[in-house]
């Protein structure tokens, strides 16, 4: 096999020497360069194909391993993220429940205090109403007693005044009647006097 590769090399070398050398710069060259041709044997071609196949197998295996590793790492990351998210969700849910329970407890306490306050206000209002009603009734009784006393006094005063007026009227009547009797008697007496004195003339 070495002999074949040596022969191939020497053949390639001799062919390459057969072309004229061009020492001028390539950008000034207008003639095309001929590419070197390498002659390979069937064995080297087979060996190359086998190497390419092995390289392709290795690349395929490495790609598969890399893909599996990425899948595994992605699955682990997803599981970890899911676990963390579930833990955070549970923690948030627990905190929300605690907050809700605390708020419910405070709302219950506030409701109880409000009911107690309403009961106290209602009781105080009823007590104040009863006191006011009692005071009003007492004041009404006093006013009624006062009015009754005033009425009795007025009645007594009116009756007393009526009696006094009656007495006064009787006094006046007696006086007037007495005077009129006196006047009548005097008039009769004067008339008699005159008549007797005219009889003498």
Curated annotation (Swiss-Prot):
Residues 41-155, 177-201 are annotated as: Disordered. The keyword Zinc-finger does not apply. Gene3D superfamilies: Helix hairpin bin. GO terms for biological process: cellular response to desiccation; cellular response to salt; response to wounding. Residues 57-76, 108-144, 177-193 have a biased composition (Basic and acidic residues). Coiled coil: none annotated. The keyword Phosphoprotein does not apply. Residues 41-54 have a biased composition (Polar residues). Keywords: Stress response. Induction: By desiccation (leaves) and by abscisic acid (ABA) (leaves and callus). Belongs to the LEA type 1 family. PANTHER family: DAUER UP-REGULATED-RELATED, RE19971P. This is Desiccation-related protein PCC3-06. It comes from Craterostigma plantagineum.
């Amino acid at each position: 096999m070495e002999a074949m590769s040596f022969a191939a090399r020497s053949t390639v070398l001799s062919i390459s020497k057969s072309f004229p050398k061009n020492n001028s710069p390539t950008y000034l060259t207008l003639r095309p360069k001929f590419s070197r041709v390498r002659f390979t044997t069937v064995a080297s071609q087979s060996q190359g194909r086998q190497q390419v196949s092995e390289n392709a197998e290795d690349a395929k295996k490495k790609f598969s391993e890399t893909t599996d590793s990425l899948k595994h790492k992605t699955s682990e990351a997803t599981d970890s993220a899911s676990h963390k998210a579930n833990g955070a969700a549970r923690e948030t849910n627990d905190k929300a429940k605690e907050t809700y329970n605390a708020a419910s407890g405070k709302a219950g306490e506030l409701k109880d205090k409000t009911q107690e306050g309403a009961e106290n206000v209602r009781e105080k209002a009823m007590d104040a109403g009863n006191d006011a009603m009692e005071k009003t009734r007492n004041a009404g009784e006093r006013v009624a007693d006062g009015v009754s006393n005033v009425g009795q006094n007025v009645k007594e005063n009116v009756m007393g005044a009526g009696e006094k007026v009656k007495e006064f009227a009787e006094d006046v009547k007696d006086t007037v009647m007495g005077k009129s009797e006196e006047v009548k008697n005097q008039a009769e007496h004067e008339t008699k006097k005159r008549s007797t004195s005219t009889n003498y003339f």
